[in-house]
Every structure is written in C-alpha cells, then in structure tokens.
C-alpha cells in the first residue's frame, strides 16, 4: 500500500514533467522572439522572408501533390485490384520511408551531376555536350519537390491503404447499379470516404517537409527552416532565428487545423455490423503489367535506386568509407538514440499510466501536450532548447565556483544531454501513442481483479500491464530508436563540439562535396530503418473478399 501511495504521485509528477519538457522549447522560442531586433528584422523582411515563405509554400504544395497522387494511387491499385507482383509490392511500397530526405537528395544530385553515373552512361551513345544537355537540374524547387515527395509518399499510402481495404462493397455496388464505372466509383465513392485518412497522411508529409533542412539546403531551396539555420549560423542572431521560428510554429498550427478540417464528418461506421469488404478486381494482360509498373516506379525511385547507389559506393570506396570515424559516429548515434529511447519510453509509460489510473482533468491535458513534440520541426525545437540548456550550464558553473570547485564546463551541451533531450521531446508522441493503443486493448476488469486480490497499482502494472504491453513497447522502442538515428536538424545544432553522429557526418561529407565518402554511414541508417518499416507493413494488411 505504501508503494502505491508513493507510486501514484511519482507517476503523476513524471507525466507533468513530460508535458513541461515538451512545452519548454515553444515557451522559450516565444520569449526569445519578443526581444527587439529592428535592424535584423528589416533585413529579414526585405531579403529573407519573401523568398522563404514563397519557397516553403511551393515546396509544401508540390510535395503534398506528389505524395497524394503517388500514395493514394498506389494504395487504390493494391487494395482494389489483383495483378502480377501485387503481394511483393505490398511490402515494397512503404520502404522509401527508410530513406531520409537528405540522403535521397545527396544520392540523386550525385547521380545526375556532370560526370556522374547518368552522364557517363549517356556519353556511351551521345556526345558529352548533348548528354549534358539532357541532365535535369535537380538543385531547384522542382527537383526538391520530386525527390522529397518520392520518399515521403508512404505516409499517404499507408493511411489510404488501410481505409481502402476496409471500405464496404455495398457502396460500390450501389454506385454500379446506377451506371457508375470503375473510375467514377473511385472518384465519387472511394476517394471521398478516404478523405480523413488522406488528411492524416498529408499532414505527416507536410510536417516532415517542414522539418527537413538537409535536402532543402543542398538543393538550393530557401525554406523557412533553412532561413532559420542560416540566420543563426551566419548572422549569429538567436532573436532573429526565434522570430522566424514563430512563423514556422504558426504554419504548423495551420497544418494541424487543416488536417482536422480534412477529417471532419469522417465516416466511422459501415452500413452493417459486419460489412462485406470490397473484393479485388483482377487485372490481367497489359492492364496487370501497367498496374505493376505504376506501383513499382515509386519503389524504384524512392528506395531501390538510392539503396543500390549506397551499396555500390560503400563497396567501391571501402578503403575510404570503412575507416574508424564511421564506427565512432555509429557508436555516438547508437548511444544517443538508446538513451533517448529509454527516457521516452519511461515518460510515455508514466503519461499513459497517469491517465489510466485517474482519467480526465489535467492528466489528460498533459498527455495531449506530449503529442505536440512530433509537430515541432527539429531545428525549431533545438533553438528553443538552446537558451534553457545554456542557462542551466551557466548556473552549474556559477554554483561550482561558489562551492570553490573547478569549472565543470558545458555539462548538458558537452555531454550530449541536450541532443538526447531534443530527441525525447520530438519523439515522445510515439511511445505515448503506442502505449495508449496498447492500454485500450487491456480491459479495466483486469485492474479490478488485481485490486480485489489485494494487488496495488504498481504490482498490477508489473504483473499484468507490462507483459501485455510488450508488443507496444517493442514497436515504440524500434520506431523511436530509428527516428533518432535519422534526425539531422536538432543533432546538427545541439551536438557536442567535435562529436558527430551518422546523420551529421553525412551532412558534413555532402557539404564538402564528397558525399560518396559518407556512403557507408548513409547505408547504416537505411539498413537500420528497413526493419521497422517492414514491421509496420506486416501489421497493416487486412484480408479482403475474394477477387
């Protein structure tokens, strides 16, 4: 009983701490942005903001369009039709999520640059100058739209496929009795019913696009996120960067509002208690192979081409890529990611336990606050953490001097604790979501039975909840760990001096124009990401009616 009396306040305190931790960078950004910087702001208004807002809006619209057309189209084909290779494509279509946007950008620029692989191949049949004229200009806004869109479309694909698979056959049959063809059924029935799922997928695509800095900067697109980075790095103005960050936060709020608007009046029930799911229509002959080609092309461009390039460069340049630095960077990445995963799981578990033990009120509010972190672009989050972290480091140094001890230096920044904190804030929504879904499958009767047997809340959690939550905990741990490995913006700003991770070392190689030397580091990130994507795909397929 004493343990229970201590446990509940402790868990509640951890839940409040988690919410406060997520809210801290937002609060800090607003406070820093309130500092006057008239000279810099006039410069931003005249020379930075117009292009940054224009490029950001164009990139969001363009990437969203590519992701919507590719994701919804392929999801409809594999959900509603049978054709050669469909079973394989079900597994392959989500795999571009394993390729970070910045790695995709580095790969394609390297492939299509003068004297790159594509140019050298074309010169086998064409004069060098004619071959050069055929190369597309990827360091441009259209290039960024295509590259980022082709690796982010699986967000739309996964959400749309889940909806298409669950649609009742009755709606399509009713439309066909009224003379509607297959295309009209898709346009007027299937697509509107999938609108809420498409809104969720597009919101994730937009948030990931806003978070990107590596691809946009490398491809010459001056987004708001890139402008924040250059304002802080080149002009040394934290206030100016914070003011630009506030604009990004407003944009994030607008995207979330649009996502909720897109999910309005969502159809959550079918016309009967056990709906008959829509059977798949067989595509044979040329139609089947065209469907296969339409689904295989995004996989080829978004996953297979980057993967083969990284494999080739890693083997071809093995003496350069397989040096001690890459393994040191891998160790740093794994260390930061492991620590962040453990802390995020602990805080996520405390947050959901607090709402289960006493639903509603401030506990539910705290749980909702923890979901904000994933919506924060990593660079904005890092800027918001920078001032509090440095303030704590300075306070520790002052306290050490007051005690007559030697100066400890930058404890949080120098140890990597700032990086781990940023990871926890950004990805805390993942374990919270996984564990909330896991707890929803555990009836409250189990808790009542444990109490009637004299077991306290901690005993029930240890003996009942945790064993049943193992799949949710494992899934959350895998996703958080890999997301931490891939995170570039926050790591770039908060990493300790002279410490690199796999993501930042790739960025440094690309900045020096020698991305091939970082191919093995990129390959390690991709290899670590394939497993979680395949794991998520395994649990997203739903049996349908016979073809």
Predicted feature locations:
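Short, charged juxtamembrane terminal tails flanking transmembrane helices
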Residues: 3, 539-547
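Feature of multi-pass inner-membrane transport and sensor proteins
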Residues: 122-123, 168-169, 184, 215, ...
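Glycine-rich helix-loop "coupling/hinge" segments at transmembrane-helix boundaries
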Residues: 210-235, 486-515
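Polytopic alpha-helical membrane proteins, predominantly small-molecule transporters/carriers
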Residues: 53, 179-180, 188
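Membrane-water interface segments at the C-terminal ends of transmembrane alpha-helices
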Residues: 6-37, 45-165, 193-213, 241-260, ...
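Short alpha-helical segment that forms part of, or immediately flanks, the ligand-binding pocket
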Residues: 172, 447-448
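ABC-family ATPase nucleotide-binding domain "signature/switch" substructure
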Residues: 448, 452-453, 463-464
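The alpha-helix within a helix-turn-helix
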Residues: 175-176, 450
